[in-house]
Amino acid sequence: MYRETFVFCVLLAVVSANVEMRDLEEKPEKYKGVNCCYVSAIQECIPVGETRPFKHECKGWTCNKDNLLEVSCGKVLVEHYVEDKTAPYPHCCPVAKA
């Protein structure tokens, strides 16, 4: 049990994310009545419960019923990690190397 707790605490310290909550934007007429979050930056309406990656950054938007979350990888707290900056979020986030 001690080992599992220790490993969990280490992973918790190594893995972090950055989340910013945004108010929902007003939807254009064509999206009125659609259960989605309109994002003017991409001129797209993301269905509630889904995530869309940013085009040129390792971030994503997650649509919730009452808000839009802008999510990114956060900081890596280890010296050795791998990342694929060409992959869409969240696959572009750094991962600790064993």
Swiss-Prot record:
What are the protein's UniProt keywords? Disulfide bond, Secreted, Signal, Toxin
Q: Does the keyword Signal apply?
A: yes
Tissues expressing the protein: Expressed by the venom apparatus.
Where does the protein end up?
A: Secreted
What are the GO MF terms of this UniProt record? toxin activity
Q: Which top-rank group of organisms is this from? A: Eukaryota
Provide the record's note on post-translational modification: Contains 4 disulfide bonds.
Secretion signal span: 1-17
Gene Ontology cellular component terms for the protein in this record: extracellular region
Q: Name one Pfam family in it.
A: SVWC
**Which family does the UniProt entry place this protein in?**
Belongs to the caterpillar 1 family.
Function recorded in the entry: Probable toxin.
* Official protein name in the record: U-megalopygitoxin(1)-Mo1
